[in-house]
Amino acid sequence: MLAITVETDARVIAEEISELAEVDYVVLTSGRADILCEVLCNDSTHLLELVNGRIREIRGVRTVEVSTYLRLLKQTYTWGTG
């Protein structure tokens, strides 16, 4: 999970992030982070390349906080996007 703060329009940056193949979902949020996104990487090297090499290079990205899942206790998906 990535918590991203931005200096410019979060909607524009979220759209750009959503184009990355590793990104599962992107949401605009209220609170400390402007954007939250879940990413799927093969290993820590892949995650490092994604965060440092691509996401932090997007114009307007201020900070990226990475939280890795240690254990998934529950995941339910029953709603649609329409």
Regions found by a protein language model. Give the residues of each.
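A compositional/biophysical signature of low hydrophobicity enriched in polar/charged and small residues
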Residues: 1-82
